[in-house]
From Swiss-Prot:
The gene is arcC2. It comes from Staphylococcus epidermidis (strain ATCC 12228 / FDA PCI 1200). Keywords: Arginine metabolism, ATP-binding, Cytoplasm, Kinase, Nucleotide-binding, Transferase. Its main location: cytoplasm. Belongs to the carbamate kinase family. It is found in: Cytoplasm. This is Carbamate kinase 2. It is an enzyme of class 2 (transferase).
Length: 309
């Protein structure tokens, strides 16, 4: 039985709980069709917009004496539960409609990072809402946040994005899979923790979910990693008149595109880097990058970027 890790992008999940649920209902049909065809899948997801909104809302409440401030790791855990719940519901309903008897479980997942990771001094991971330059400057002045322009869509807050070292709950994930459970894990790249003297402590950061997904896929010896985002292909010259979607490309070709500066930091670059990390560990595997809405067409080979060695 072929194994596939499917990583859903947080930006591709819509801008509200209802929009997210509607998108997940559609996506669940494609995911369950994979199960129906005999594939074993594990699902991960991003949380950039969601964790940023949760953090912003709780901070607003705290500033107005309506509750305590919440640390970022706890906000990450809330986003795993919120997104995971909607995924579970959508997948359970679709599995039932297809007559497939399968449990679905969301596992709150911690991922170990290094306390001396250079990312803590160089925040790059966009989270939360898009703002104008004026709004971003105001937040920077008032709260000390760091903002970057995000692919022509506006300005977003950025936080540290350290490299994932190990998945704390990996054994539990493998046990659930062995028992035939459909597992949703490593949401938002996992809750980042550091380990000192055998004690785990959460840190303020967001791990790139694609890199954690690549790590998970490698550990599970998956045949394919599917990265779902907001666009149908990986593009070169993105946003320009001569932009071009890539169809099937080799690892060497993708490395050249990276060296040419084709992919934006905090956007497509980490997805491509994650793809290459997985293919380095699993040389016979493949990575498919496409849109959440277009997964069905991508599985039929009509759209998407397929990367192989």
């Amino acid at each position: 039985m072929s194994k596939i890790v499917v990583a859903l992008g947080g930006n591709a999940l819509g801008q509200s709980p209802k929009e997210q649920l509607d998108l997940l209902k559609s996506t669940s049909k494609s995911l369950v069709s994979l199960i129906d065809k005999g594939y074993e899948i594990v699902i991960s997801h991003g949380n950039g917009p969601q964790v940023g909104s949760i953090n912003l809302g709780l901070n607003y409440a705290a500033e107005h004496k309506q509750g305590p401030p919440f640390p970022f790791p706890e906000c990450g855990a809330m986003s795993q539960a919120y997104i995971g719940y909607q995924m579970q519901e959508s997948l359970q309903n679709e599995l039932h409609s297809m007559g497939i008897d399968k449990e679905v479980v969301t596992l709150v997942t911690q991922v170990q990072v290094a306390s001396d990771d250079s990312a803590f001094n160089n925040p790059t991971k966009p989270i939360g809402l898009f703002y104008t330059k004026e709004q971003a400057d105001k937040f920077t002045k008032e709260k000390g946040y760091t903002f970057v322009e995000d692919s022509g869509r506006g300005y977003r807050r950025v936080v540290p994005s350290p490299q994932p070292i190990s998945i704390v709950e990996l054994d539990s994930i493998e046990t659930l899979i062995t028992h035939g459970t459909l597992v949703i894990a490593a949401g938002g790249g996992g809750i980042p923790v550091i380990k000192e003297n055998e004690v785990y402590t959460g840190v303020d950061a967001v791990i790139d979910k694609d890199k954690t997904s690549a790590l998970l896929a490698a550990h599970l010896q998956s045949d394919q990693l599917i990265i779902l985002t907001a666009v149908d292909h990986v593009y070169i010259n993105y946003g320009k008149e001569n932009q071009r979607g890539l169809d099937e490309v080799s690892v060497d070709e993708m490395k050249k595109h990276i060296s040419d500066g084709q992919f934006a930091k905090g956007s497509m670059l980490p997805k491509v880097e994650a793809a290459l990390q997985f293919l380095e560990k699993n040389t016979k595997g493949s990575v498919l990058i496409t849109s959440l809405a277009g997964l069905g067409d991508a599985l039929d080979g009509k759209i998407g970027t397929l990367i192989k060695n």
